[in-house]
Amino acid sequence: MAAAAPGSGAAREEEGTGGDAATPQPPAPTSAPGARLSRLPLARVKALVKADPDVTLAGQEAIFILARAAELFVETIAKDAYCCAQQGKRKTLQRRDLDNAIEAVDEFAFLEGTLD
């Protein structure tokens, strides 16, 4: 068997798929804008946007951006709440962890009192 040139990727092909199975593959691109790039259902986000009487039209790109922003927001507050749970030597998030995260992070000040 011939030696693989450095950087050619041939050596990785000979190694088999052992290392490839653990590596997450990005989703295949599709023709629909925002398809598979958002974990929230875009139809549901669009329905929520249309529920606002002040909104008359919302483009697909705007719906996608709102869905992505909501995902990032939920991810951020969940991580902060999980840190609060870890401080209490727990792995399960509880309501008090969300309350503590809201109190601890200035960016979440607008949420104070919403869980009451």
UniProtKB/Swiss-Prot annotation:
Residues 1-10 have a biased composition (Low complexity). CDD domains: HFD_POLE4-like. GO terms for biological process: DNA-templated DNA replication. Keywords: DNA-binding, Nucleus. Its main location: nucleus. The keyword Endoplasmic reticulum does not apply. GO terms for molecular function: DNA binding; protein heterodimerization activity. Residues 1-36 are annotated as: Disordered. One of its GO terms (cellular component) is epsilon DNA polymerase complex. It is found in: Nucleus. InterPro entries: CBFA_NFYB_domain (IPR003958), Histone-fold (IPR009072), Transcr_DNA_Rep_Reg (IPR050568). Component of the DNA polymerase epsilon complex consisting of four subunits: the catalytic subunit POLE and the accessory subunits POLE2, POLE3 and POLE4. Interaction with POLE3 is a prerequisite for further binding with POLE and POLE2. Accessory component of the DNA polymerase epsilon complex. Participates in DNA repair and in chromosomal DNA replication. This is DNA polymerase epsilon subunit 4.
